[in-house]
Amino acid sequence: MRTDAASRRNHGSGDAAGTSVNESGMIHKTVHVSPAGGAAGDGSAASPFDDIAKAAAACPGSTILVHGGVYGRIALGPEASGGADSPTVIRAAEGERVLIRPDGGTGIRILNAHHLILEGFEVEGGTHGIRYESTREAGNTPLGGVAIRNCTVHGIRGVHGICVYARNDRAPVTDLTVEGCRVYDCECGSSESLVLNGNIEGFRIVSNVIFGNNNIGIDMIGFEGTAKHPGSVRGRNPYEADFVRRGVCRNNVVWGISTEGNMAYVSDGHFDPCADGIYVDGGQDIEIAENFVFCCDIGIEVATEHSPDDNPLFRVSGIRVHDNVIAGCRGFAGLCFGGYARHLGYTEGCEFDHNTLVDNDTQIAVQRSRDNRIHRNLILGGESGVVFNESCRPEDLVNRIDANAAAGIRDRESWRAEYGPLSPDRATLADGFRTLAPDVGSRWIPAPEWTELCREQMKRESVKEQL
């Protein structure tokens, strides 16, 4: 097998620049792909490949430089994998627009690959933009080192913008990165704009911009059966690996996420406003920090949609939500945690601190949960401060809420003295989105261009409501 692989890796060297052999034994070089290339191309600048997947399979561990133009669907398999010291890098050429138009289906699909970086692509249309998937065929070895960077996905009509489905219950996807991507104008149905689902251990979702989609912005999911053990695996909890865990969701901007107009969420002739900007749905041990979420149905939510009556693992823990700014979320709440019905799984052992919540109708919604800490948050405006789900038993709503600060809440009865001081004038606590209260509110401030856009969007929403 090594001899055959080496033969394939030597193919197409031509006059490619920068050829070297790394510790993995792979030959690293720069390989060119262009719509103007031919089937007989050798991957050199003078004679490029015409097929991205062909280039990646022929030269794993190399840099695949993709030149501008329009391409069809791309399918990358395990043969495109690089090594730990030499990942396969598939990158749009500097200053050139590489557009993937799938004409239905998935724009870019990656299956059971590892140590692969996808960078600088634009996907327009189709049912999925970029999809990375692991399956049991990958065996018992974790798949690590996959990164999706600086890609743009828009015009999806069907399911996901960017999705990672780790279906292999035998071994996790590890060291996963989604960074610097833009996902917008997507009709997701009952799915999500950017989602991680299944057996994923160790990830980064950082510096992405997600906007104008009709369902959840960023979702980290567990317990849907994506990586459930098959019936042949006995004596173990079938869901023990079926959840996203140990990751970071940081420095993302998410706005304009709403189910308004989404026919998957029609109830009694009305659209149910339930799309989160950022959602942990069954994920565990995740840090959510320094994100700006505005004008969504729900800002940030931490919960599970499954019942512990069905499996004791169906609960959420180890989530820390801190130093985020959440504004103008008027569908349901700015910050929400806990199972939305009395039988659904607990959110427990989580911490929500140093967030700034501005003019969300309900600032904090508490649902089935216990032993969480909600402190050092700054609450500005809004109809209600803290609202409890009345369908839940009182003993399922026991959390510690203290040391916060609030101003301008219209329903003053929704704010108890033990939550923290309530001021009549918000100008004493904040200058715009910047906190003036010592050790309360987000210590991180969004960039001025984003705060200005937020103000404009909130004004538009206010005018729309008046009409």
Task: For the regions a language model picked out, list residue spans one by one.
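Right-handed parallel beta-helix/beta-solenoid
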Residues: 12-14, 18-54, 68-70, 94-96, ...
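Extracellular beta-strand solenoids
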Residues: 33, 66, 76, 92, ...
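Right-handed parallel beta-helix/beta-spiral solenoid domain characteristic of secreted/periplasmic
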Residues: 35-37, 46-48, 65-68, 73, ...
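Right-handed parallel beta-helix
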Residues: 67, 87, 93-97, 114-125, ...
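Structural detector of coil-to-beta-strand junctions
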Residues: 73, 106-107, 115, 129-131, ...
